[in-house]
């Protein structure tokens, strides 16, 4: 881990304290007064792109009693109008780490669940996020850790597909399922179907759209103004996932896009926890991956990066 050049500082976020982690390649801002939330991620070289994350306005209204705020958050799945939207407005327990920070919210009164997030800088362009849900209630809870990253609009997302098989060579069975939500319209130009990936042209979404997938190479990417954000969470073979088996989901409404990964479903007894790990990468200078050639370049870059994590 090459973290000796990481800087750790504090700043204000909407009247509350936040922590800033800075390397040569990026600056990350994490709230400590509410959340846990990662509210900003900027590239040093790609400063034109600004904050890659969506930031809701200061006068944001609550959504089902919950401030979305923007950025990256931890929820518990399956989605429920009461359980999922518990407010996270209280100050956090904060533990500084040599290469990052660990954060934990107070236990949610209505669910008995406590959310925690550990953020570690692995090198100048790589982050490791460990999400945890702990059951402090009186009975077992079936749930999954759900890591959602809200990225600002104007860009292009890619979801790689599994390698193609050959019918002639005896590949007779399916390898994954595509799971659209009830409001998803697959005829819209927001979806770009390619042989090796699905492209999502965010500005072309004029209403809420969402789909999930039951198996994929474990990474997704979002390109905006020359900066590419990648998140990686490998699929656990044989595990049962929420939402008809989805370890990955994507939501967009044209103003933003959410790249979402999930842990397997688990039944948490009182005192038990489930963890879910994502790795993030920030890359500059790659082309918009809307063509097969540009996607191939992105996939090669991401492949090398993933190998460096092991």
What are the roles of these predicted feature ranges?
Residues 1-310:
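Surface-exposed acidic/polar loop and edge beta-strand patches at domain peripheries
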